Amino acid sequence: MGCCGCGGCGGRCSGGCGGGCGGGCGGGCGGGCGGCGGGCGSYTTCRYYRVGCCSSCCPCCRGCCGGCCSTPVICCCRRTCRSCGCGCGKSCCQQKCCCQKQCCC
């Protein structure tokens, strides 16, 4: 089950998303999430320790990654372009991240 795309699950997402998930995950987003370290400052990175944790389990990175990722990634929510490590090896720009096949810079 997990918390893929449910939006309202803070912290570790243990126990599911409790209501209002609408449509479910649509794909194998199993398991929970690791801890989402740190606050949400300009230079914060949130690390996802399991598959399917983009945009719902880490509040400060919500909206940075679109949908589920196929592998655990480091999603950078930064205002400047830096190395991203989200799979395509380019960069993150304007608080958006390249967790899909193409970067959104």
Curated annotation (Swiss-Prot):
The keyword Repeat applies. It comes from the Eukaryota. Residues 4-41 are annotated as: 10 X 2 AA repeats of CG. GO terms for cellular component: intermediate filament. Keywords: Keratin, Repeat. Coiled coil: none annotated. Signal peptide: none annotated. Belongs to the KRTAP type 28 family. Human have a similar number of genes as other primates despite the relative hairlessness of humans. In the hair cortex, hair keratin intermediate filaments are embedded in an interfilamentous matrix, consisting of hair keratin-associated proteins (KRTAP), which are essential for the formation of a rigid and resistant hair shaft through their extensive disulfide bond cross-linking with abundant cysteine residues of hair keratins. The matrix proteins include the high-sulfur and high-glycine-tyrosine keratins. This is Small cysteine and glycine repeat-containing protein 10. It comes from Homo sapiens (Human). The gene is SCYGR10.
